Structures are given as structure tokens and as C-alpha cells.
């Protein structure tokens, strides 16, 4: 598995400003966590998405950082403990 964080410098509240990815050996996302400026963490697992290149996903405005498994698991665990989606707006 490969682990990445993509970070964008924008103020849009309805777009994630951080994206944490777990990619399998083919480059397909298996788990991801979207982080929004309002403090909402949106974990997604059991993904069925095509292979992706984190640098392409970041575009010209994003920064890509390689993570290790422990770092990704820490973020994943945090995201599972926090309210998400609509309920996250109230915390």
C-alpha cells in the first residue's frame, strides 16, 4: 500500500482542502479521508475507483506528501471518531 496527503490552499468550505489516500499496488484508492475547512472529516472506504496518480489529482495548486501507514491510520481513526456530513456542522 501507498499513502499520501494532498493539500490545497483555498478557502472553499464545500471542497476538501486535504485529502488522505490509501492506494493499493495498482494505484487504486482503497480508503480516503476528505478534510474540510469547517472541521468535517469525511472517511470513505470500500472504494471501487480506477487507478490514480496523486500528483495529477493535486493539480498545479496542490501539494502531495507521502505518508507512512501509521500516519494514515492515525488520520483514519480520527475521522471515524468525529461527526461527519450534516451532523459535523453542529460540532
Residue ranges and their predicted role:
Residues 55-91:
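Short, compact, well-ordered microdomains
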Residues 38-58:
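Acidic, low-complexity, intrinsically disordered interaction modules
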